[in-house]
Amino acid sequence: MINDIQKTAEGKMQRSVEVLKENLAKVRTGRAHTGLLDQVEVEYWGSMVPVSQVANVTLLDARTIGVKPFEGNMAVKVEKAIRDSNLGLNPAAVGDLIRVPMPMLTEERRKDLIKVVRGEAEEGRVSIRNVRRDANDHIKKLLKDKEISEDEARRGEEAVQKLTDKYITEADKLLTAKEEDLMAI
């Protein structure tokens, strides 16, 4: 029973870290990466689809993303979708290739982004702690119902705490890496 609780808790904590990683990846640094356009959608045959489904998205250099639509007539729509995406990007079409240069971040904008990143990391840590609380509550319920001994309950809570420490450390490492990435010029 305790092992099931631990496995469930670990899976949920792992998912919390993955969500944090995804959220941190969405925060734009001065460096280009193709994942930046994952959330941008463009109209194609009457429905909204991600840019990656109608175009080849590549890195041209460290500060420029290249977007080459599979169909030439989509270039204008893709360019407009990127411009209207609230990412602060200014794409420029060069023939059938759309160049998306990454604007330099100002010092003030970097500090604002660091606040956002720290908030995301704190949400991740809170999520991990909530999983710990739920697991410990489940263990206490089993103890109260006399399905496990006090020693088993204590060992279970200690194991859940170790998992919590492990995943909070992982979240902190992600935060530190993102902060360093943001402050690099």
UniProtKB/Swiss-Prot annotation:
One of its GO terms (biological process) is cytoplasmic translational termination. Belongs to the RRF family. The gene is frr. Its main location: cytoplasm. GO terms for molecular function: ribosomal large subunit binding. Transmembrane segments: none annotated. CDD domains: RRF. One of its GO terms (cellular component) is cytosol. It comes from Neisseria meningitidis serogroup C (strain 053442). Keywords: Cytoplasm, Protein biosynthesis. The keyword Protein biosynthesis applies. Responsible for the release of ribosomes from messenger RNA at the termination of protein biosynthesis. May increase the efficiency of translation by recycling ribosomes from one round of translation to another. The keyword Transferase does not apply. It is found in: Cytoplasm. HAMAP family: RRF (MF_00040). This is Ribosome-recycling factor.
